[in-house]
């Protein structure tokens, strides 16, 4: 599985409010428990004052990520980038040195 940084920003205050309602509903209906085994969340940060957030996940594919994030896609700009943690970064640097 690959680690990814997901960054998102709501397009406006109305979309942020609607997204918040969707998040509460998802959470209260067991959303966390019904994530696929091929999707793990390591950290999640949301700055409510400006409608932006970031999370670091491990997933088997971008398809898995987009299936989970699809409901919010029209409400916010979402970017997904591969990333590494510190140990992975150090390991990669060591492998690429002569």
Feature locations, PLM:
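Conserved, structured core segments of small domains
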Residues: 1-98
